[in-house]
Amino acid sequence: MIQPQTYLNVADNSGARKLMCIRILGASNRKYGNIGDIIIAVTKEAVPNMPLKKSEVVRAVIVRTCKEVRRDNGMTIRFDDNVAATTNQEGNPKGTRVFGPVARESRGYNFTKIIPLAPEVL
């Protein structure tokens, strides 16, 4: 569960290291975001000489959360950290690589371009 003011790590090589969620897109009063949701975030920590700079506002897709997600077959899955992958306005990833596993739930939300970049899909 991601809410505004939540800090997230970045799963791609776009140049950002940490993001802070400022809005969950969807309904006008949406309070929480889960895997596969789009958020608007601000870059809090960045790598020097990379495309994304500190204090830049970006869109991102949540790919891992600490809060467990229940699947249709009864299995629950959770991760050790909250992680997002940065995207552009059309939903295409800004980075060329994704680090760490990505939850299978993000496939159902039409983010099929992030799935092939990931080394593992859980």
UniProtKB/Swiss-Prot annotation:
Key words of the record: Chloroplast, Plastid, Ribonucleoprotein, Ribosomal protein, RNA-binding, rRNA-binding
Gene3D superfamilies per UniProt: Ribosomal protein L14
Bilayer-spanning residue ranges: none
Places the protein is found: Plastid, Chloroplast
Cellular component GO terms, alphabetical: chloroplast; cytosolic large ribosomal subunit
CDD domains associated with the record: Ribosomal_uL14
Subunit description: Part of the 50S ribosomal subunit.
Function: Binds to 23S rRNA.
Name of the protein in question: Large ribosomal subunit protein uL14c
